[in-house]
């Protein structure tokens, strides 16, 4: 099972497993490298890369946040004629996914996702803080509106 897989459409998530026969191949798979599995994750001839290519996964990305295995932090491939070809980052060190319309970069140990317009997407903790800030802002606007109405 991949560490992370992405489809371009909704799939049944309550099954507990990925079913290629039902869902088809994911558009993009991410594997986070570890000392115990990196050779299998990076093996395009017998390992996961081989299996993912045979399944028709169009984009395959491996990420090493610690950079102990991959000094560059990310190694990725795109499927062409049934074989994975190296997928290089663009000049800004972002890997742009043709399949799902995002770009990924690695800054330090953190992967950063950008939307198709280049805007950085918020991380989980940032989302909670932004929601709290918006709630506070909304409460203040409601208070000002009530005050203006004379309530």
Language-model-derived ranges and their functions:
Residues 58:
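Short acidic/polar active-site loop segments enriched in Thr and Asp
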Residues 1-55, 63-151:
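C-terminal interaction segment
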């Amino acid at each position: 099972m991949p560490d992370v897989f992405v489809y371009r459409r909704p799939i049944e998530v309550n099954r507990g497993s990925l079913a290629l026969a039902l869902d088809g191949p994911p558009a993009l798979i991410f594997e986070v490298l570890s000392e115990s599995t990196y050779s299998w994750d990076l093996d395009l001839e017998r390992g996961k890369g081989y299996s993912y290519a045979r399944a028709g996964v169009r984009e395959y990305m491996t990420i090493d946040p610690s950079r102990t295995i991959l000094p560059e932090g990310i190694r990725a491939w795109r499927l062409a004629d049934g074989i994975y070809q190296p997928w290089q980052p663009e000049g800004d060190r972002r890997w742009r996914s043709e399949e799902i319309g995002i770009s990924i970069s690695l800054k330090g140990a953190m992967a950063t996702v950008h939307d198709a317009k280049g805007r950085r997407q918020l991380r989980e903790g940032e989302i909670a803080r932004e929601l709290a800030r918006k709630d506070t802002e909304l409460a203040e606007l409601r208070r000002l509106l009530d005050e203006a109405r004379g309530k």
